[in-house]
Amino acid sequence: MGKIIGIDLGTTNSCVAIMDGTQARVLENAEGDRTTPSIIAYTQDGETLVGQPAKRQAVTNPQNTLFAIKRLIGRRFQDEEVQRDVSIMPYKIISADNGDAWLDVKGQKMAPPQISAEVLKKMKKTAEDYLGEPVTEAVITVPAYFNDAQRQATKDAGRIAGLEVKRIINEPTAAALAYGLDKETGNRTIAVYDLGGGTFDISIIEIDEVDGEKTFEVLATNGDTHLGGEDFDSRLINYLVEEFKKDQGIDLRNDPLAMQRLKEAAEKAKIELSSAQQTDVNLPYITADATGPKHMNIKVTRAKLESLVEDLVNRSIEPLKVALQDAGLSVSDINDVILVGGQTRMPMVQKKVAEFFGKEPRKDVNPDEAVAIGAAVQGGVLTGDVKDVLLLDVTPLSLGIETMGGVMTPLITKNTTIPTKHSQVFSTAEDNQSAVTIHVLQGERKRAADNKSLGQFNLDGINPAPRGMPQIEVTFDIDADGILHVSAKDKNSGKEQKITIKASSGLNEEEIQKMVREAEANAEADRKFEELVQTRNQADHLVHSTRKQVEEAGDKLPADDKTAIESALSALEASLKGEDKADIEAKMQALAQVSQKLMEIAQQQHAQQQAGSADASANNAKDDDVVDAEFEEVKDKK
């Protein structure tokens, strides 16, 4: 069995880790970094860039540089959170035919899982380069508060990237695994506060140790899947835009290039203010008007940033109270607080969390790497490399069906340990009803319409009977990934209908297969592109070395040969401007054939040089015998 890699597919950054013996190891990508920006760019010449290369060109290509895609994955276009992003993102968010939030990239419609798959492919390649073997299996993490559609979409992204997703696990749970595996023995209750680039989670986790086996049991989880560092950046960007408008009378929101530069500067300023009390946002030539170029130079203090984002930090406190209440615990029951996600480096966040729990968060957990490490540990558990670890996660939201009067009737309540299975018997609402519609919902509201619709299906062939007589057994079965399977059975006729919830939206099997094929085709195209680049480099080297040899040969090279070589060189240089690898190779071969006389001259010159240097060495040796210099040491006067 090959390695199961652990991937933290983050909103802002992603990270990949593997089990190396009994220790998890975070892997460096091709750029030498342990985390990779979750940024994907589609360039004008058709190239797809991922990570740092994509980030570097964002200023000049804002419409086709995609970031924070995790905020759209598994979401409907009409969702309130998506509509908020539509107005502020430089790229174009559109509604797919099924109502999902998709993206328009250079006129092509693309699904968020398809785009996230590019990041996963880079993580896969990073692991393959390190291991020296193909990687086909992964554990991928998601925010604990992700709903069924978002989890399913994440699995789809894995498939498109060529990975079999062996398990989806919650990010705070993964962080707890990373923390708890090598920590002190005994029973502990920990709170994992996870504020990342786009999502927020809180999980209360109990770590029990019995006879050397550690059980990680999630007692409760809560959160907000649309709260994170991107929102903090937006507040600072808006402030800078308004300040510039007051000063210069120009609204930068109408200038995509300026906004992209401003986004980078705001992110940098936010990070600097975690360690400094003040920073300058200095952007020369940010824009121009009839009077000439305009420059931005605005001082931002830590206090100013904190005043801009205080309500965002406070938004994360309410879920902490709910999670503790759901776990049946008080603040004093928590032994350790762990911070995960880059945004937790902000001193204000650390202070608020410390105030709430009455204790300082631990500083020995890397907020950027803990989640990927935990995913790798779970991969090790699945392969049997990691023993004596049992992970008991929960479903974050209640699951149920719509019943008479538009009511949501839960079958599985939130914070139930998974995997789990629950059945309940329902009946018909009308006399002689021959079919029922099972409408599956996820959420905590009483009214069905206020919850997230996960999908619906019909159970037909119910025998005619007075209302309330037929017995229809509905079974909900949640697997270890937190994905729901629903069945409905008429106990009288034995008729049964089953579905795996794919949401009323989501990608269908045909779409996923098409994207898998496209990804494979792209991989082939990437391989051909690499080969073309290598051939071009060889040809460039050949052109350079041949010209140098022609120059060195001088009059020794016959005029006919020189003309033939110049002609072959021109043909090769013209070929280099094209994309045809075979043509470049043919022109290289042609140049080699007409350069045979030149090669002979070059070899003769090389041999003469060697002989000359040998003679010089011999003369020097003789001189060594004859000359015996006398010298005396002159000491410097101190």
Curated annotation (Swiss-Prot):
It comes from the Bacteria. The modification Phosphothreonine is found at T199. It holds the Pfam family HSP70. Signal peptide: none annotated. Induction: By stress conditions e.g. heat shock. The keyword ATP-binding applies. InterPro entries: ATPase_NBD, Chaperone_DnaK, Heat_shock_70_CS, HSP70_C_sf, HSP70_peptide-bd_sf, Hsp_70_fam. Residues 603-620 have a biased composition (Low complexity). GO terms for molecular function: ATP binding; ATP-dependent protein folding chaperone; unfolded protein binding. Residues 603-638 are annotated as: Disordered. Keywords: ATP-binding, Chaperone, Nucleotide-binding, Phosphoprotein, Stress response. The keyword Nucleotide-binding applies. CDD domains: ASKHA_NBD_HSP70_DnaK-like (cd10234). Belongs to the heat shock protein 70 family. PANTHER family: HEAT SHOCK PROTEIN 70KDA. Acts as a chaperone. This is Chaperone protein DnaK.
